[in-house]
């Protein structure tokens, strides 16, 4: 018996409703197969990878001011409603009454990895003059689902156009999927008074797809897909590093208020593991160190923040180090002493100058000349560095969120400060040293 390793054509017979046919199958002409209910990425790959959750929140116990920034005007409010484990957003009957909710962090994105942003939301029946929006956007770039008071729409916006912000808005009559008006393949009519799961799948590269889905009773109903490839002369939005955002506004002064938008859980899931890869940056104190005048008092060693020109940058602190020496008199040798440390978000820093990192590509500024930390701020990490272990580095938990965010709806960077204190009450004038390392995703 001989064996021929080269592929050979084969003929396959099949019948359909009494008829028969012969198909010759080769490597060049394979047998066609079709898979039902299988999703693929924008590159045509089957979605078989393990997804990674980049962001989620649940509002079990409050409005989560450490994660979400809120701006209200003309009597609008945002409040925690324990009966729905969510946030009620409310505007008054006055024109211009508005509430905006936006994550302090922009969302991480890795090119080549489609991502899905999910909202649990409850709208209300559309009311002329009342506008609701939610999606991944910052007012200048991104995408969102909109109820403008008269119609629903899927929208992308781009600030990189020569004539200002470019808007592509597709109303319900223009959707290329199931319009969920009772006349689509599902026969479903989406209720604005019911809690809904609305998902937006996107891929950037400047020319990716943006898909809008409703998830109802375990089934995905695609309502519209925006195709940007081979069509636009510019990226569909300037950056994929954008915040999750919801808006509610009384645009015309509808007098029958208040009007509501109810925000539930959110999640952002990426296909495959993105890992926290990026460009490393590091800053340290001067080699002469920094004097700690009084024992058991915290002093700032180093602080970092986003550049005012890079507020959508993704900065992930990873590692810091501290050490201290004390010399009781010029005739004595310096000794290593024990320290307490704290890593503080938005300390009330006194004095100092913010300086751009030497790398012109960096997203960050540093400050090593501040003199006090005040009493404000949130301690993200704390601990002790004992004598002989002085200089030991502290690696931050990779699964904990330390990303530097923004407030003022994206206009003011958070700060991250490494502060230390001498533990020994008999030590004054010790000299401390420190360094911080972080990753910038570009």
Where are these regions (language model features)?
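Aromatic sugar-binding interfaces of carbohydrate-active proteins
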Residues: 143-145, 190-194, 199-285
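Extended, low-complexity segments enriched in Ser/Thr/Gly and acidic residues that occur primarily
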Residues: 1-71, 77, 271-332, 420-421
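Flexible, glycine/threonine- and acidic-rich loop/arm segments that mediate assembly and lattice contacts
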Residues: 34-117, 121-124, 205
């Amino acid at each position: 018996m001989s064996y021929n390793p080269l592929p050979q054509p084969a003929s396959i017979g099949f019948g359909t409703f009494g008829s028969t046919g012969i198909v010759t199958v080769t490597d060049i002409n394979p047998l066609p197969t079709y898979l039902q209910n299988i999703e693929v990425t924008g590159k045509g790959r089957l979605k078989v990878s393990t997804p990674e959750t980049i962001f989620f929140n649940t509002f079990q116990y409050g409005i989560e001011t450490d994660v979400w920034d809120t701006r209200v005007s003309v009597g609008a409010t945002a409040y925690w409603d324990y009966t729905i484990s969510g946030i009620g957003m409310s505007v008054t009957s006055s024109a211009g009454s508005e509430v905006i909710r936006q994550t302090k962090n922009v969302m991480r994105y890795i090119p080549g990895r489609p991502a899905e942003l999910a909202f649990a939301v409850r709208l209300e029946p559309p009311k002329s003059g009342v506008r609701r929006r939610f999606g991944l956007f910052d007012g200048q770039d991104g995408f969102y689902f909109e109820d403008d008071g008269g119609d629903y729409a899927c929208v992308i916006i781009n600030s990189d156009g020569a004539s200002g912000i470019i808007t592509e808005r597709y109303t319900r009559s223009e959707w290329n999927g199931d319009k969920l008006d009772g006349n689509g393949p599902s026969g479903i009519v989406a209720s604005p008074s019911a809690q809904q799961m609305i998902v937006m799948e996107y891929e950037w590269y400047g020319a990716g797809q943006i898909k809008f889905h409703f998830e109802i009773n375990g089934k995905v109903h695609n309502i519209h897909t925006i195709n940007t490839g081979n069509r636009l002369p510019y990226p569909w939005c300037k950056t994929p590093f954008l915040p999750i955002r919801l808006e509610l506004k009384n645009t015309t002064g509808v007098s029958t208020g208040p009007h509501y938008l109810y925000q539930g859980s959110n999640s952002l899931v990426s296909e495959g593991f993105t890992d926290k890869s990026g460009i490393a940056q590091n800053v340290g104190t001067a080699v002469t160190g920094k004097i700690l005048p009084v024992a058991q008092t915290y002093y700032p060693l180093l602080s970092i923040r986003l550049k005012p020109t890079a507020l959508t940058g993704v900065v992930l602190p990873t590692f810091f180090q501290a050490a201290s020496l004390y010399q009781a008199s010029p005739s004595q040798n310096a000794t290593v002493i024990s320290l307490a440390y704290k890593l503080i978000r938005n300390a009330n820093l006194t004095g100092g100058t913010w300086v751009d990192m030497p790398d012109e590509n960096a997203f960050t500024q540093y400050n090593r000349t501040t003199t006090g930390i005040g009493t404000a701020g949130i301690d993200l990490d704390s601990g002790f560095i004992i004598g002989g272990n002085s200089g030991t580095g502290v690696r931050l938990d990779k699964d904990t969120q330390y990303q530097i965010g923004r407030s003022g709806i994206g206009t003011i960077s958070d700060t991250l400060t490494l502060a230390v204190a001498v533990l020994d009450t008999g030590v004054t004038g010790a000299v401390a040293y420190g360094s911080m390392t972080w990753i910038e995703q570009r």
